[in-house]
Regions:
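Alpha-helical transmembrane segments
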Residues: 1-168
Length: 168
């Protein structure tokens, strides 16, 4: 449980590096949890979670208006860490923690890319696996426009969330 919580919180924080990336990915994950909680029906815990999750979706959509490229408002560590905590806590309360690697795949990829970069750097005495970690910066340095990286990561998250909903 602790590893899931820590990994998700850090994954959300690592994802907050491009305009609109963390907020667009997290709004989709929060939508997944809203639909999942509503689908759980008469469960008292789920009945208390879906309004909070729905409010998170609404607040992120409002924030996203000002956070997309070129961003005028930035989330910062406080926001991204809080969103990671929200995702982890919601998954744990709904007993869907095994769904985090599916619906929050982007978070996991971001964390794993940083871990792989550090490990490879130490093992090869200074060589890099990626141009920069987390992986979204690698794509950006490879010439991808920031908006393309955000769009692809958001589409990937949407597909993963749909897979998660089908799996429930």
């Amino acid at each position: 449980v602790f590893i899931i919580l820590l990994g998700t919180v850090n994954g959300a924080n690592f994802t907050d590096g491009l305009d609109g990336l963390a907020s667009s990915v997290t709004v989709l994950i929060a939508t997944f949890f809203t639909v999942a909680a509503i689908g759980m029906g008469h469960n008292d815990l789920a009945a208390g979670i879906w309004p909070v999750s729905c409010a998170t979706v609404g607040s992120l959509l409002g924030f996203l208006v000002f956070n997309v490229y070129p961003a005028r408002v930035f989330m910062g560590d406080t926001g991204s860490l809080a969103l990671g905590g929200f995702v982890a806590a919601t998954a744990l309360m709904l007993r869907l923690s095994l769904f985090i690697p599916i619906v929050a795949l982007i978070y996991m990829i971001e964390v794993l890319s940083v871990m792989a970069q550090v490990l490879y750097f130490k093992m090869t005495k200074g060589k890099r696996l990626f141009k920069m970690a987390p992986i979204h910066h690698h794509f950006e340095l490879s010439g991808w426009p920031e908006t393309k990286v955000v769009a692809i990561f958001a589409i990937t998250t949407a597909v993963c969330c749909l897979i998660g909903l089908v799996a429930i």
